[in-house]
């Protein structure tokens, strides 16, 4: 087994390598003057079980091309099996046609990864579960909920917690956390007027006096979370914390979160945190390196991955 990484999240890759007690593989990923990407694998991988870790986060297109070119390089170097490890799967929000004459880009990206030569895929908290079916190769969708549940139990009196889904579509995800910490569930019903903006309409459930835990897969602009936090506090919530797997946090999201009524935003390192995120007073980062590392170890040993979440 050998683990390699592109440039998108080397800090996480190094932590995963440390968990696995193996060195991070030697590979050069660089750009020519015209910004074409060039990859050189700097050690023998013939007959090896290769894992390449790369989040296709901002800049999504560059990081996706890095991944595809790395997979091609491993295939042409006679690797026995190539597993693409995507802690964050970019383009996942384009999983259906929102209107006429529009693409399903998540399916296209799945096709590209497969055609490049990947044998299987490991990813984390896909935006929509059906994206697993976009791949024609084995695909394991991991869940951050065990990591998040441990953090909640370490920092909150769970008897007073209420897990809140920020929209109706996230109810199943929120329920999984609520079951693990034995908490009740509430829902924020919202109407999205335009991309990046949302209007909170109603809170379904009695949150009065509760420490509310918003749980979702992606935070991008932060508008939904900030509006949801305000709505919950207006309904009498004691405090509002958000637990989100993927901290995209584009544009002015960090400043928006910092000035919001959220007690804290807790994200994972599926996307490498920026300096602004690390310096933000009310944003905290949980590492999913042990979860990713254990999934890689079990995949390499042909053991069950799903039992991680039993």
From Swiss-Prot:
It is an enzyme of class 2 (transferase). InterPro entries: PRib_PP_synth_CS, Pribosyltran_N, PRibTrfase_dom, PRTase-like, Rib-P_diPkinase, Rib-P_diPkinase_bac. Keywords: ATP-binding, Cytoplasm, Kinase, Magnesium, Metal-binding, Nucleotide biosynthesis, Nucleotide-binding, Transferase. GO terms for cellular component: cytoplasm; ribose phosphate diphosphokinase complex. Its EC number is 2.7.6.1. ATP binds at residues 34-36, 93-94. The keyword Magnesium applies. The keyword NADP does not apply. GO terms for biological process: 5-phosphoribose 1-diphosphate biosynthetic process; purine nucleotide biosynthetic process; ribonucleoside monophosphate biosynthetic process. Mg(2+) 1 binds at residue 127. Its cofactor is Mg(2+). Binds 2 Mg(2+) ions per subunit. Mg(2+) 2 binds at residue 167. It catalyses: D-ribose 5-phosphate + ATP = 5-phospho-alpha-D-ribose 1-diphosphate + AMP + H(+). One of its GO terms (molecular function) is ATP binding. The active site is at 190. PROSITE patterns: PRPP_SYNTHASE. It is found in: Cytoplasm. Signal peptide: none annotated. D-ribose 5-phosphate binds at residues 192, 216, 220-224. PANTHER family: RIBOSE-PHOSPHATE DIPHOSPHOKINASE FAMILY MEMBER (PTHR10210), RIBOSE-PHOSPHATE PYROPHOSPHOKINASE 1, CHLOROPLASTIC (PTHR10210:SF41). Belongs to the ribose-phosphate pyrophosphokinase family. Class I subfamily. Homohexamer. Involved in the biosynthesis of the central metabolite phospho-alpha-D-ribosyl-1-pyrophosphate (PRPP) via the transfer of pyrophosphoryl group from ATP to 1-hydroxyl of ribose-5-phosphate (Rib-5-P). HAMAP family: RibP_PPkinase_B. This is Ribose-phosphate pyrophosphokinase. It comes from Brucella melitensis biotype 1 (strain ATCC 23456 / CCUG 17765 / NCTC 10094 / 16M).
